[in-house]
Amino acid sequence: VDDVLANTPLFSALDAHGAEALRSSLSEMKVSKGQELFHEGEPGEHLYLVLDGKVKLGHGAPDGRESLMAVLGPGEMFGELSLFDPGLRASTATALTDAIVLALGNDQLMPLLEGRPAVAAALLQALARRLRRTNEAMADLVFSDVPGRVAKALMELGEKFGTLTP
């Protein structure tokens, strides 16, 4: 647990006292494969951190199709937009495997951000990385054909979750 947390943007920017305060505010959730953590269109009140397993973020179309936005593994955050924008969830989070996630409510994080600009900066950096990936995906939609986009997605998943075999 501590190894995963130490490598997340939220924890890496905290001193020992702040990290302990944040750790005590987290709620552990065990989710089964296929279980939704939240659904697109619901109000967002928590950010989540994958501790074990894999979670996908998807966006549904009116005709029932789903666009895969991200596959997340241990140490990755999601749902953090709800901390800064009280709007509705823009995606559905579903466990791809049995997973353990940590949840942090908006009301628990905001006091930790006050007086800790390094934590706020780490969150902004995580959001900026996500925006950069979104911009790249938009460019791919415009400039790449379907086989090219599928190949790129498979390569990215392989780099992120694959293991090298001789």
Which residues are covered by each model-predicted region?
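Short phosphate-coordinating micro-motif centered on Lys-Gly-acidic
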Residues: 37-42
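Glycine- and acidic-residue-biased ligand/ion/polar-headgroup-sensing regions
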Residues: 34, 45-58, 73-75
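Cyclic nucleotide-binding regulatory module and flanking cytosolic helices
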Residues: 1-33, 82-83, 115
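Cyclic-nucleotide recognition modules
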Residues: 19, 70-132
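A residue-level structural signature of the nucleotidyltransferase/glycosyltransferase Rossmann-like core
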Residues: 3, 47, 69, 101-102
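Polybasic "coupling" helices that flank or enter modular domains
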Residues: 96, 114-166
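Short alpha-helix-to-loop micro-motif enriched in aromatics/charged/Gly
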Residues: 62-67
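Well-ordered beta-strand positions
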Residues: 30, 48-49, 94
